[in-house]
Amino acid sequence: MSLPAPGWTAQDIVAHLRSIGTEENRAGMARFGINNATALGIGNADLRPLARKVKRNHERSLALWDTGIREARLMAAFTGEPKKIAIEECRRWAGDFDSWEIVDTVSDLFVDTPFWRQLVEEFAADEREFVRRTAFAMLAWAAVHLK
């Protein structure tokens, strides 16, 4: 496989992720309360540099999310384009949240959308634990980064 590049497809990224994951990392995630049911065993220290290499791409981020794989979903958040993601896509992603880690990561992307305040209101009123947490994670991110 070639080196990571902006032209990589979602399938290329997933294949690469499958090749670098470890069972040791996967087991370690559980100790931190991270849902590892779909995890390949790759830490954020490896995912973030990969995301910088493949760059942002909205359509690819949607395809990565749809794999259901923990690391692919984190890559979707890291490489998503906040000006292109639709509010309906944000709502759909939030409905899939199953871990504090994914909530806190995707919240960073959501805050950069033009409709983030509307999402905060909706998500804060939601009964689902991780959707509601998203509202508060978004507010925390906004308080620090949107001055």
Positions of PLM-derived features:
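Alpha-helical scaffold domains
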Residues: 1-147
